[in-house]
Amino acid sequence: GITVFVVGHINKDGNIAGPKVLEHMVDCVLYFEGDPNTSYRLLRAAKNRFGSTNEIGVFEMLDDGLAEVPNPSQMLLEGRPEGASGTCVACVMEGTRPVLAEVQALVTKTTFNVPRRAADGFDFNRAVLLMAVTEKRAGMKLNLLDAYINVIGGLRLDEPGADLPVVLAVASSYRDVPIADDLAAIGEVGLTGEIRAVSHLNQRLACLLYTSPSPRDPKT
């Protein structure tokens, strides 16, 4: 056979630049991402003609090369602080795989005329909506405070089941009351403040039985 190398260009956003001809030529487009300060790397599929693009692979760079991380949830919760306010564990679906991730929130007094909102690893507009629901339904005066949301480990939570962990993390930081270390939250939050069930609940619960969210009780 003949091996052909096709050279493309990646723009500043990390996407394939120019016309989509290069993406149309191939069956699969994979992104290998990770924080340069850690040894962990995430493998994501932006295009996959033979399967889901929601699946992720987690790898660790060792002395003898890359090795698969068999339990990504344990890796993503590694180093989680005990008894800290503003943190909650979420159980989300990455394709067909349930994964535990830590959601952190910081609510603090603003120094600006208009309070700041920021979200890393979570949709910004969804975060603003959930904060509005929290303020209206729970009576928290977030309109006078800065609020920041961060998902640890480089994951991006873009499913309804991550709503409740975000709301709980924000409320925990606002009240400065820690959430129980062994508690994980799953649920969609509506505009009236109700909590709705999400899909694949049995799989998520099985993941929680396999990997404890508590840093004091790491199951393997």
Describe every region a protein language model picked out:
Residues Y210-P215:
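Conserved small/polar residues in nucleotide/adenosyl-binding loops
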Residues N54-C207:
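Conserved P-loop NTPase/AAA+ ATPase motor core
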Residues T3-P81:
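Phosphate-binding/switch region of NTP-binding enzymes
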